[in-house]
Design a protein with these regions (language model features):
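Nucleotide donor/acceptor-binding cores
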Residues: 2-3, 129, 157-159
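Short beta-strand/turn micro-motifs composed of small residues
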Residues: 9, 32, 82, 108, ...
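Short mixed-charge
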Residues: 47-61, 128
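Rossmann-like NAD(P)-binding element
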Residues: 55-105
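Rossmann-like NAD(P)(H) cofactor-binding subdomain of soluble oxidoreductases
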Residues: 84-147
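Internal alpha-helical scaffold of NAD(P)-dependent oxidoreductase catalytic cores
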Residues: 146-173
């Protein structure tokens, strides 16, 4: 059973996912590059990520880091919550640190699994990981203040998902 999850992305959906998964009892690491370090500083200073609107409460992820090695190490699942134009960047950043058995879930997918697979092949990555995409986003949301996300509809942690190759879907769901 998955317990340790890394959420990549320090935008509104990444904040929402990190807070939601922390609320659900998972050990969450929140990661993005140094361009977003001030957001992690805000989360630390304010005692967590505050959810408003359709979700409520303040939740502190176990780890906030801009170090990809720290973010990926021992994560059982890696949720990628970034815009599609960052998929290649993220794939390249995490590739050297991947470990056998990890599940990479791209939300929303936008065919990102193909980008990740291409990058991993190009870089000669041999770790046995699954690549899965979730249809749609976790929830409509917006950063409304430092370390605060307003959620417009209930969080949809389920929805449709598929892996690449499709035969891996059963390993993930």
């Amino acid at each position: 059973m998955v317990q340790r999850i890394t959420v990549i992305g320090a935008g509104s959906t990444g904040h929402s996912a990190a807070a939601y998964l922390t609320q659900r009892g998972f050990t969450v690491t929140s990661h993005d590059d140094s361009r977003f370090s001030s957001r992690f500083e805000d989360i630390s200073r304010l005692g967590g990520i505050t959810l408003r609107g359709e979700a409520h409460g303040t939740f502190m992820p176990a780890c906030l880091t801009t170090d990809p090695a720290q973010a990926v190490h021992k994560a059982q699942a890696i949720f990628v919550h970034v815009m599609a134009d960052r998929h290649e960047e993220i794939a390249r950043r995490i590739a050297p640190y991947l470990e056998d058995g990890q599940h990479i879930v791209i939300v929303p997918g936008n065919l990102g699994a193909f980008v990740f697979r291409s990058v991993f092949r190009e870089m000669g990555i041999s770790a046995d990981v699954t690549l899965t995409e979730k249809e749609g986003n976790l929830c409509p949301c917006r950063l409304t203040a430092a370390a605060e996300v307003t959620v417009g509809l209930p969080i949809d942690a389920e929805g449709r998902a598929a892996s690449l190759p499709a035969s891996d879907t059963g390993r993930v769901l």
